Amino acid sequence: MTISPPERGSTAKTQVEKVDNPATFELFGKPGHFDRALAKGPKTTTWVWNLHANAHDFDSHTSDLEEVSRKIFSAHFGHLAVIFIWLSGAFFHGARFSNFSGWLADPTHVKPSAQVVWPVFGQEILNGDMGAGFQGIQITSGLFHVWRAWGITNETQLMSLAIGALVMAGLMLNAGVFHYHKAAPKLEWFQNVESMLNHHLAGLLGLGSLSWTGHLLHVSLPTTKLMDAIDAGQPLVLNGKTIASVADIPLPHEFFNQDLLAQLYPGFGAGIGAFFSGNWAAYSDFLTFKGGLNPVTGSMWMSDIAHHHLAIAVLFIVAGHMYRTNWGIGHSIKEILEGQKGDPLLFPATKGHDGLFEFMTTSWHAQLAVNLAMLGSLSIIVAQHMYAMPPYAYMSIDYPTQIGLFTHHMWIGGFLIVGAAAHAAIAMIRDYDPAKHVDNVLDRVLKARDALISHLNWVCIWLGFHSFGLYIHNDTMRALGRPQDMFSDSAIQLKPVFAQWIQGLHAAAAGSTAPNALAGVSEVFNGSVVAVGGKVAAAPIPLGTADFMVHHIHAFTIHVTVLILLKGVLYARNSRLIPDKANLGFRFPCDGPGRGGTCQVSAWDHVFLGLFWMYNSLSIVIFHFSWKMQSDVWGTVNADGSVQHITNGNFANSAITINGWLRDFLWAQAAQVINSYGSNTSAYGLMFLGAHFVWAFSLMFLFSGRGYWQELIESIVWAHNKLKVAPAIQPRALSITQGRAVGVAHYLLGGIATTWAFFHAHILVVG
């Protein structure tokens, strides 16, 4: 930490400007008001596409960084308003159309539902039997499990949340208008990163986690302890009254009574005095370090979760006091960056990170790229933890929800990471000034780009041929009837020794890394089977040859995705083929007429191609997860303790050939969606067909050129002219880039919705 004389800190001054810029619907109601050319109105049908392309591209509206910053800031509030409206809808469905109370009363037999289809002409077939006499559509979002963890015990509370979320949405819309049209922050406020870090770390994350800890301790902990006791058939007694049903549980405000809490957790009786006297051990009954899962609910211990949030709060509150603002103490991000000079032996860089502070505070695309890469990676980490360390009660035995949440968080992560590459490339084109980056780390990476990309390309070729080659070998050997010559657990073994070592390390280290923990961090690492309601909630995940092989397919597809995206960023400004690429912008179809072979070189085209490989990568990841869990983890527990897995452990022997994946996974597990007609999952059958159609529709845009359509349009316009019904707005074919955008959008939408239907129809029936 650097301590400097007080004059180094900036003095407090107003960072908000009062603006007289009234919000008028007259202006908003005019399409294209943000762009001179678009504001003139449509002459051709291209106008509507340009309207969509540029509406949120604030850089194209103005070059004033302060104005762009204010628009982004205001849009954030609009986004938050949409999120609150969406949340309100979820709460409202829970309050009005769900079996939440029925599920709380018997979570191992009742399935969660928050939607009832009204009969028009037979649609009520979609309402399946959810148990306890409720007919509806099964939901797989995990919301019931989350609500139980919050301590919600009835539908009235959900209705209050629904109303509260709408109020919050109104406040957010108001804030968005206020901070753009009435009192708008100055550019220096947006660029004051130390203040932002302090407030976001200490305030948002630190105090946010601390207040959430308070809720967990004073509401969630007592409520869920009483519910767990009811579910275990051993109800607890409060004030001499047996809490035999959810309706008997005191409401949250009643837990303000400390004596009530102390009956459940004696540590609450110690009061606040124990905190200030340093007698923190008094709180050890509700701030625990148990590890493992609660055997009643198959989820992490609520007291562990509360302890975790308290620790996070302390860390972030400390972190939020580290950066230098009005007082001359603390870190300066600019000084930290400019102090980085590389490794003197391996990578000496005298200019190090010089210029990066200015780049990151004047290019919001560069800032966004870093944030998207981090958030996308975090989403993928969340996907892994939701099954390995399930945080919410009974979620681990709700297999449809487990597959749904894994798939959802993987795809969200993939889209965000591709977005990171997109905005990094935009930053390079619109915001990067080569004169300000001479021999710093960014410049050095750009100078080394040929070595980086050619080596990465070699890695992709190596991984692709070797991983796919193992499968081709196995398919061939199996076809020739030579199982002894196959790569498999029973013939030529390819054990994932590094993965097994990491699994063992985590299992063995539980006592040493967390000295007071009573159990390992996760049962998936050489733990034991946790069964809830006769179903497997968690179990060790054995890894073998089949996992080793598909892991290398993952490595291959991820590396190709990175190759495409990284090439797009590193060659965004220029290349040997097109030295003046930066002048052509982020998206362009080709380098003008007369230069053949220069199509699909724009940074936008790399994002376009990267999206296909991202989809490719993650399809294999979610297929691997879905099949592996059904084969080796999930299932029913027999009376003798043995486990009957959903697909009877067929992964190890079937997933080692291409034919096995096609026959024993895709084809076998599509049986439910293909045979869904006439049952309550028939909507997924229709979705499966419809989404295949959307996917096939995308190929029309991807496989045909613009000229074909322009020619067709001109003959159709001729016919309209003959009949004297010619349109005033001239029809035009989509541009090359627009066609590709429509194509990839439908490709992904069709593919994702097909997978959604395939997974749901199957696991809702067998899970």
From Swiss-Prot:
Subcellular localization(s) per the UniProt record: Cellular thylakoid membrane
A single GO molecular function term of this UniProt record: magnesium ion binding
Residues the entry annotates as binding chlorophyll a: M700, Y708
Membrane-traversing stretches: 72-95, 158-181, 197-221, 305-323, 364-387, 403-429, 451-473, 548-566, 606-627, 681-703, 741-761
Reaction equations catalysed: reduced [plastocyanin] + hnu + oxidized [2Fe-2S]-[ferredoxin] = oxidized [plastocyanin] + reduced [2Fe-2S]-[ferredoxin]
Cofactor note: PSI electron transfer chain: 5 chlorophyll a, 1 chlorophyll a', 2 phylloquinones and 3 4Fe-4S clusters. PSI core antenna: 90 chlorophyll a, 22 carotenoids, 3 phospholipids and 1 galactolipid. P700 is a chlorophyll a/chlorophyll a' dimer, A0 is one or more chlorophyll a, A1 is one or both phylloquinones and FX is a shared 4Fe-4S iron-sulfur center.
NCBIfam families registered for this protein in UniProt: psaA
Family recorded in the similarity comment: Belongs to the PsaA/PsaB family.
PANTHER family: OUTER MEMBRANE PROTEIN, OMPA-RELATED, PHOTOSYSTEM I P700 CHLOROPHYLL A APOPROTEIN A1-RELATED
Annotated HAMAP family: PSI_PsaA
Protein name stated in the entry: Photosystem I P700 chlorophyll a apoprotein A1
Organism of this sequence: Synechococcus sp. (strain WH7803)
Top-level taxonomy: Bacteria, Bacillati, Cyanobacteriota, Cyanophyceae, Synechococcales
